[in-house]
Amino acid sequence: VPNLRFPKFQGEWKKTKFGDIATGFDYGMNAAAKNYDGVNKYIRITDIDEASSTYTDKDIVSPDGILTDNYLVNNRDILLARTGASTGKSYLYKQSDGKLYYAGFLIRANVTTHDPYFVFSQLHTHRYWRWVSIMSARSGQPGINSQEYSSFPIYTTSIEEESKIAKLLSLLDERIATQ
């Protein structure tokens, strides 16, 4: 339980596994990128901004492959980088980013019963990055697979408290982005 809380909220927070509050943990499509077709965007690790964890549309491309809904990014989806120096980088889907298909070096988790921004915010903590460092240090090439990501400890509380915290954090993130 954090030391500072909004008034009226009390009680212990619950420690659970990411895989207990999210579904999927699916790998993205194995396709090359091609020129943007005007509709279908392809998000790769390099399209996730390092500082803001948002989709960067500086170099929009489309996937060069068979487009199925299996690889579409949807509301409540979090994408996680699974290999290389960017292991641990994450992105929370926003409808304003448009129709996105995700690439094979990303893993998609859909947060089902909790506030996705609240969960996403926990993927930007010192605790998370320490976990990423430990989990990905086992071999010469850093990486975390879907089963390992699903084991990451997540803290949860009531949906009302999560939503209030998420709203505050998103307002702060928006404010920082406009500076």
Q: Model-flagged regions — what are they?
A:
Residues 1-7, 165-176:
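Hydrophobic structural patches
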Residues 4-27, 151:
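Non-catalytic DNA-recognition/assembly elements of restriction-modification systems
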Residues 7, 64, 107-111, 151-156:
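Short, well-ordered beta-strand elements within core beta-sheets of diverse protein domains
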Residues 19-32, 46-77, 93:
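Sequence-specific dsDNA recognition surfaces
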Residues 43:
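Cleft-lining beta-strand/loop regions that shape enzyme active-site pockets
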Residues 48-60, 78-103, 116-121, 130-134:
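Short, ligand-facing micro-motifs at secondary-structure edges
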Residues 99-105, 137-160:
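A short glycine-rich beta-alpha junction/loop motif
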